[in-house]
């Protein structure tokens, strides 16, 4: 008698990117190719009306009446949906009450949290919107891990962590050997554990492994609200001020104070896009003594005031945080 495939549902919101979906789908397809008993059938369901995103159309059909067909269900989005429709919310809560395993990929954690279905659970939250998520959903145990599997809830922070979570699923269902085989099939160097960090090591971000530079930047990142002076940083890392300035100039092409200012401004921009805090609150949180001081520094670096930037960028994606500083001569 032929075994019935395990149907894994992917409930998609319009802003889902092809990468997020294809990582999950290909892991299941590779498992089926490599293991005759790894019978997975992806089922793509649309949470909202179809929409084209970046030249592609989401696969799938309307979710209505089909959630209960899934042995596991993942909510998938790459931008936080504004709200969950009452009918869909009711269906998801009923599914959760039935004991079904429900997960979320990338910003799919937002609708799951909005419904209270992550309260008291650990959830992996992408570092870009971690501040916003923790502010909005204090009952969720938000982590900065790649993925979390907490009882009947599975969450991946996004990006390649989606594949990491699916490999963990394969390992639980069919053993580590299959997960390893799928990893090799997809040319993945190694299988990462869920509790590994999301961000690459600081030395890779800086392009240098100079120990004094790394120590100084870590100090800056840990002291955003109450910035240290260059002399204080130099003292902490046991070099003279002139030595510290030479190191920064050599590796980062700027003096420590300029790098520190840019670090604080980028943190401020991230908070502007991802939290509902006032502009004054954000400025103070990032070490600026007054609103005018913050606004002036922000405009000099980004070319717009904090208010203008928040209004413009929230017209697009709430999670776009790549900065475009003003050209300097």
Swiss-Prot record:
A cellular component term, taken from the record's GO annotations: protein-DNA complex
One GO MF term attached to the UniProt entry: transcription cis-regulatory region binding
Q: Does the keyword Transcription regulation apply?
A: yes
The UniProt regions of compositional bias labelled Polar residues, in chain numbering, are: 319-329
Signal peptide positions are: none
Question: What biological function has been recorded for the protein in this entry?
Answer: ArgR could be a transcriptional activator of the dauBAR operon in response to the presence of L-Arg.
Q: For this chain's UniProt record, which GO biological process terms are given?
A: positive regulation of DNA-templated transcription; regulation of arginine biosynthetic process; regulation of arginine catabolic process; regulation of DNA-templated transcription
- HTH araC/xylS-type domain segment(s): 214-312
In Swiss-Prot or TrEMBL terms, this protein is called HTH-type transcriptional regulator ArgR
Q: Which Gene3D superfamilies does the UniProt record give? A: 3.40.50.880, Homeodomain-like
Keyword Transcription regulation tagged: yes
Q: Region (Disordered) spans which residues?
A: 307-329
Q: Which residues bind DNA?
A: 231-252, 279-302
The protein's UniProt keywords, in alphabetical order, are:
Activator, DNA-binding, Transcription, Transcription regulation
